[in-house]
């Protein structure tokens, strides 16, 4: 997806870009400082998120463990883009000399990190959606259904899956089937999460009225669950906005690579990378502002 070798050999130090030199449209150059600034902000924010959850025992619950997984994925995509930007700059200015083979391997590592982050983000968001669904609709059985051990197994499974999928997607990126598989995974998970949230928000009020009369039921717990669902719906919305251009780029790359309009859209790949990094910056802000609401 990204072409580190192309950027370095052409002396383009305005950030990583896609290897699409045939586009008749001018590429939108973005300065190195923009990538590095966003990467640093995202890294610090997500470290604070993970640290806050680790230190606050009240947050040692499945939902926040899944949020930690999402924060790690956000850190990974920011680190990969920042690291690649620095590498491009060093190679272009002759501060770092590598063989073509080494550059290609390094490029694959960066791209794999982005794919791993993507799959981990999608799976973590889905895990949180399922957790909120169980919390709201199976409140009395939640502690039994979502145990700490089960939560840990889910997170381990998520990262095992994404660690395996990421390199495969990059090694076989020229295969149309691989790109279609990645896009299909994205759309399927979005559809599933949207269905869960739609069902939650449409049925939650009626469900609450039915169980509110049960002995020992506390309305505050339900409000907290709904608050968590709203927060994660916001995270999902930001994820869609920030990652959708990247996936549209992939779709156009295999469906109409020679079309003028498609080529023009794909020539702005740097901007789509910036949007992806913005997602990593915005997520911790959502955690912070939503946690302050009563």
From Swiss-Prot:
Residues 54-65, 131-147, 204-231, 290-294 are cytoplasmic. GO terms for molecular function: melanocortin receptor activity. It is a multi-pass membrane protein. Keywords: Cell membrane, G-protein coupled receptor, Glycoprotein, Membrane, Receptor, Transducer, Transmembrane, Transmembrane helix. Receptor for MSH (alpha, beta and gamma) and ACTH. The activity of this receptor is mediated by G proteins which activate adenylate cyclase. This receptor is a possible mediator of the immunomodulation properties of melanocortins. Residues 1-29, 90-106, 172-178, 258-265 are extracellular. InterPro entries: GPCR_Rhodpsn (IPR000276), GPCR_Rhodpsn_7TM (IPR017452), MC3-5R (IPR001908), Melancort_rcpt_5 (IPR000621), Melcrt_ACTH_rcpt (IPR001671). The chain crosses the membrane at residues 30-53, 66-89, 107-130, 148-171, 179-203, 232-257, 266-289. GO terms for biological process: adenylate cyclase-activating G protein-coupled receptor signaling pathway; regulation of metabolic process. Belongs to the G-protein coupled receptor 1 family. Glycans are attached at residues 7, 12, 20. One of its GO terms (cellular component) is cytoplasm. It is found in: Cell membrane. This is Melanocortin receptor 5. Disulfide bonds: none annotated. The gene is MC5R.
